[in-house]
């Protein structure tokens, strides 16, 4: 699955609690809670000239690597790295709390959650419009750039985190009003500016500059995050999944000895040209989309997509039983 390096938000952490490994999950979250940068409170924005200004200079103390940033190595808050792994890590932590109900651990980690939300707002919603930029924040992010625009999936992550923070604050007897207000603000911004009613889909993002156009052909990550983070209402979920069904390429699985003739994979987008992380046939993206079908009430499509991904990976892949990153049908 290409876990070649320490990074705090690999999807694997989601699996610990369903497997009953609550202690392992807690160890993971504690270790990376200790990796959160505490100071300075903020810093300068310094584009990296060695990376054609496409990244921030990886230096602790710069804007992205200031208070709230979670470093890539456990129990070490001194290493700057270009990914925003905070978003997914905090989502995993919140899901862990929902599995375990561990109030004592919540209280211990509460400052980590607060600093994270402040960091996200400070760095990625600079204009305060409720739409957050996406800077290397999800698996597919390597070649995704939005130039400061408002992105559906990162805004959805921040909506859910703020909504849950308000609920968690109440459990601890704290005032969660600011988190609830931010969640309401984000939700309204997404619905007003990123829902494309004519097409029945959430846009990928809205340009920051120029005519502030909305990119109306999202990747599957936009669809499943909108559903998973509870941005989409039932009608929007249905229409968004119809977009996946009708607009995202479906690839039949054909193999010698395979008796099933109704298995199909999907690519992550309908974008061209093909390049890494922009248009792939990736197992995790396929099964996450299958989860969205389940969450959207389309269980038959969900099962068929899930089955297709597992059959291709575990039975037709390079190694029997493997859970691959990219499938054979990837270009």
In which residue ranges do the predicted regions lie?
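Aromatic-lined carbohydrate-binding surfaces of glycoside hydrolases
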Residues: 36-37, 113, 137
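Catalytic cores of carbohydrate-active enzymes
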Residues: 1-8, 43-46, 124-140, 147-153, ...
């Amino acid at each position: 699955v290409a876990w070649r390096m320490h990074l705090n938000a690999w999807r694997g952490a989601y699996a610990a609690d369903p497997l009953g490994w609550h202690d392992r999950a807690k160890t993971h979250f504690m270790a990376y809670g200790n990796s959160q940068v505490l100071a300075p409170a903020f810093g300068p924005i310094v584009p990296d000239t060695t990376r054609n200004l496409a990244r921030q200079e990886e230096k602790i103390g710069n804007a992205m690597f200031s208070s709230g940033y979670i470093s890539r190595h456990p129990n070490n808050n001194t290493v700057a790295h270009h990914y925003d792994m905070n978003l997914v890590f905090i989502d995993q932590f919140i899901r862990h709390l929902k599995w375990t109900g561990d109030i004592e651990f919540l209280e211990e980690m509460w400052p980590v959650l607060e600093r994270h939300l402040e960091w996200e707002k400070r760095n990625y919603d600079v204009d305060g419009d409720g739409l957050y930029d996406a800077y290397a924040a999800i698996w597919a992010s390597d070649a995704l750039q939005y130039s400061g625009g408002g992105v559906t999936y990162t805004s959805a992550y921040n909506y859910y985190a703020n909504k849950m923070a308000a609920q968690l604050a109440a459990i601890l007897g704290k005032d969660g009003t600011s988190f609830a207000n931010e969640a309401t603000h984000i939700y309204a911004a997404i619905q007003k500016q990123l829902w494309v009613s004519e097409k029945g889909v959430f846009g990928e993002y809205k340009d920051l500059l120029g005519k502030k156009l909305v990119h109306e052909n999202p990747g599957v990550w936009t669809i499943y995050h909108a559903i998973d983070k509870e941005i989409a209402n039932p009608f929007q979920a249905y229409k968004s999944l119809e977009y996946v069904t009708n607009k995202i390429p479906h690839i039949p699985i054909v193999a010698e000895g395979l008796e099933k003739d109704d298995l199909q994979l999907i690519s992550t987008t309908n974008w061209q040209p093909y390049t890494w992380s922009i248009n792939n046939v990736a197992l995790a993206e396929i099964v996450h989309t299958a989860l969205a079908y389940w969450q959207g009430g389309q269980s038959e499509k969900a099962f068929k997509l899930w089955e297709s991904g597992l059959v291709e990976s575990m039975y037709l892949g390079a190694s029997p039983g493997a859970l691959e990153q990219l499938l054979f049908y990837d270009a």
